Swiss-Prot record:
This is Tegument protein UL47. It comes from Bovine herpesvirus 1.1 (strain Cooper). InterPro entries: Herpes_UL47. Interacts with US3 kinase. Interacts with UL31 and UL34; these interactions seem important for efficient virion nuclear egress. Interacts with UL41/VHS. Interacts with host DDB1. Belongs to the alphaherpesvirinae HHV-1 UL47 family.
Length: 739
């Protein structure tokens, strides 16, 4: 009272229970920090549990009330829930015990309710929350992953060894998957019944079957991925940062139709839930991203040092007149005429991407149309890739059970789409990979891998066209041996790639995503230790690269070196994409899985087109040049079946047609084939820039098998006699794959 009379402020007693915390601390943390003090002053040992409101009470004839659970889950402490989900992007690399008390962060909800409370139906709560969330919500995948964990805990599969008293088996289905049996088809026959049952069993840890690869001392270093792994990781981090922090205005969205091969067989919502092609194709590509993708392609290094035109309606610069081929005479190896290289650029552009680019630009082709062809062609190829089996070829792996394949079940080769746009996209030597807007529709890592593989194949084809033409079709002895060796390796790589596309497509669309039949695409260890996860391809590389004749060809031939870099680029990019798919398949990230699947398909189309060009040049050296060329036994038979299986992606060109097309393009460009060296003033040479990404990095490994995987060397002229359709287009069987 004396202070009040004197005009000074009066100090009040601290009876309000006010507490001091950091001003940025969350409200829930401030309340929990002050609760013990308030409870102690009020004489209570614990806070009183708030009773639920009357209209959320459990009905007397029901065990639980879904409305109460949904209300408590969604509305309870909603101010903090969004922050928890957003922080998941920044705390993914923290310790295993970080956030152990939060069921949403650990994917392991409590098995029983808190003491004194009613049991919670967490599965229903998660499903209701997923229904109200939009597709673009950043934490939707987190909710789906947690719901799958809850489902697996509440409905465990039955142990077949426990007898009939074991609980009934209920297959784990994807939250957004097809209904059981959506693929249709008949049941497997009695001969395959046991194997099919083993393939359909649930396999939650697919890496256990490949644990021996980690202990194998012969694979201590794994496949040499060189600088691609770091570049892919950096590209993935940049894409995450762009999606989180870059303001992107809403783009106009269009309706994405079903692939034509699936029309009338499945609902669009069910299909796009399993393969999110709508998310990749619905939004038009951003102009800035397209410009960055074009700049990244143009700034990439090339072994010849020249700028490559990829997607343009203007021919590259070149000199008209005589086209002089052949290696320059001199002491230095790996030389080529600069004039012939620039002429080969124009020739390659006209034979490949030039016609496609001008047709697309003239018809104003929309991005949705190319996506429609691409997804339909990939699904058609997946349905026929398993039929790569025939006379003279190595036995193909066993087919997947029909219940596991689902919508991709087929009994014969699926014919390609015959529409005008599909015919256009299937031509041009499989050059869709050079379309910048198409690569932009993929995510960061698949776009990088597609660019890396496409650039390597493009540089190799330049040297292939610059060294020989119709007047001088024969290559040197070292070049012929190297080209035949790469022909065998590329065929083996393409076989593995098409096999993976078949498995990955069935895994995405099938009703049993965790079945043991999909172990090859879900396991991560094989792609960390083997090229494309294949021990057969590993042994084929060892047999080819360690040959003394092959090493001699590498020492003197620029063509052998540049094709080695192309092979390493394709195998590295494809292996990285397969590993990306396995990583995202573990948490069922459908968008990233679909992007990796499309990236492998894009590389496979370009690989089949480049393989067709390589075969025609090698066969032309024997048929028109009169040179002896040897290939591995069974290579042409395997390629013939691969060409039939990949027919929905790319149309192969036989030898006579290729020779006529090349001569016609040279006449249009006013190029005159000359078999002699160039005259004075035109004798400028170019030397191949050696790179670390060369096939020499594959030297010095040990084979995994005790028996050779490649057949003996045979004359390609005798092998072509058994496959006349590769030369003249005649002699095909009554149906695809029937030779």
């Amino acid at each position: 009272m004396d202070a009040a009379r004197d005009g000074r402020p009066e100090r009040r007693r601290a009876v309000s229970g006010t507490y001091r915390t950091h001003p940025f601390q969350r409200p829930s943390a401030r309340r929990s920090a002050g609760r013990p003090a308030r409870c102690g002053r009020r004489g209570r040992g614990a806070p009183r549990v708030r009773r639920p409101r009357p209209y959320f009470q459990r009905p007397p004839d029901e065990d639980t009330s879904e409305d109460e659970n949904v209300y408590d889950y969604i509305d309870g402490d909603s101010s903090d829930s969004a922050d928890d989900y957003d922080s998941d992007y920044f705390t993914a690399n923290r310790g295993p015990n970080h956030g152990a008390g939060d069921a949403m962060d650990t994917d392991a909800p409590p098995e029983r309710a808190p003491e004194g409370g009613a049991p919670q139906d967490y599965l229903t709560a998660h499903l209701r929350a997923i229904e109200v969330l939009p597709e673009s919500a950043p934490h939707r995948s987190l909710l789906e992953r947690t719901a799958r964990t809850v489902y697996a805990q509440q409905f465990p599969p039955r142990d077949l060894s426990a007898g009939s008293k074991a609980p009934a088996q209920r297959a784990r289905r994807s939250l957004r998957g097809f209904p059981r049996g959506g693929g249709g088809g008949q049941e497997p026959g009695p001969d395959d019944e046991g194997d099919d049952a083993a393939d359909l069993r649930e396999d939650l840890v697919p890496d256990e079957a490949y644990a021996h690869l980690e202990r194998d001392e012969r694979l201590s270093e794994g496949p040499p991925l060189l600088n691609m792994e770091a570049a892919a990781a950096a590209a993935g981090e940049r894409s995450v940062v762009e999606e989180l922090f870059t303001y992107a205005p809403a783009q106009p969205q269009v309706e994405v139709p079903l692939p034509r091969i699936l029309e009338g067989r499945v609902r669009p919502s069910a299909f796009f839930a399993q393969m999110s092609l709508d998310a990749l194709c619905r939004t038009p590509p951003n102009d800035q991203r397209v410009a960055r993708e074009r700049r990244a392609w143009e700034m990439a290094g090339t072994p010849h040092g020249l700028l490559i035109t990829t997607w343009s309606t203007v021919d590259p610069e070149f000199s008209i007149g005589g086209m002089y081929v052949g290696a320059p005479e001199g002491t230095r190896p790996r030389l080529v005429w600069r004039r012939a290289m620039k002429q080969a650029m124009a020739l390659q552009y006209r034979l490949g991407v030039g016609g496609l680019c001008r047709a697309v630009d003239g018809a104003a082709c929309r991005p949705l149309r190319r996506c429609s062809f691409w997804r339909d062609a990939l699904l058609r190829e997946c349905a026929t890739a398993i039929f790569c089996r025939g006379r003279g070829a190595r036995a193909a792996p066993r087919r997947l059970p029909r219940p596991a394949v689902g919508l991709l079940a087929a009994t014969q080769f699926t014919p390609p789409d015959a529409s005008p746009h599909a015919t256009l996209f299937r031509g041009s030597m499989g050059s869709l990979i050079y379309w910048h807007e198409l690569r932009v529709m993929l995510t960061a890592v698949p776009a990088l891998c597609a660019r890396y593989a496409g650039a390597g194949l493009q540089s190799a084809e330049l040297y292939l066209l610059a060294l020989r033409h119709s007047e001088a079709p024969g290559y040197t002895a070292n070049e012929r041996y190297a080209l035949s060796a790469y022909l065998t390796l590329f065929v083996a790589l393409a076989e593995r790639g098409l096999r993976w596309l078949y498995l990955a497509g069935a895994h995405l669309l099938g009703p049993h995503p965790t079945a043991a039949a999909f172990r090859e695409v879900r396991a991560k260890i094989p792609y960390e230790r083997l090229p494309l996860g294949s021990a057969t391809l590993h042994d084929a590389e060892v047999e080819t690269v360690d040959s003394a004749t092959f090493q001699e060809a590498l020492a003197f031939s620029a063509l052998a070196h540049v094709y080695g870099e192309a092979y390493v680029a394709v195998r590295t990019a494809t292996t990285l994409l397969m590993a990306e798919y396995a990583v995202h398949a573990e948490r069922r990230d459908v968008r990233q899985m679909t992007a990796a699947f499309l990236g492998v398909g894009l590389i496979a189309q370009r690989l089949m087109g480049s393989l067709n060009l390589l075969l025609n040049c090698v066969a032309g050296a024997a048929v028109y040049g009169g040179r002896r060329v040897t290939v591995r036994e069974g290579t042409l038979a395997r390629y013939s079946l691969l060409a039939d299986a990949a027919l929905p992606l790319v149309r192969p060109v036989f030898l006579v047609e290729f020779r006529e097309a090349r001569d016609g393009v040279m006449r249009e460009l006013r190029l005159r084939p000359v078999a002699s060296p160039p005259l004075a003033g035109k004798r400028r040479v170019m030397e191949l820039y050696l790179s670390l990404d060369s096939i020499e990095a594959l030297v010095g490994r040990e084979p995994l098998g005790s028996r050779p995987v490649l057949g003996p060397l045979v004359d390609i002229a005798e092998a072509l006699a058994d496959h006349p359709h590769l030369v003249t287009g005649d002699g095909r069987g009554p149906r695809l794959g029937g030779r």
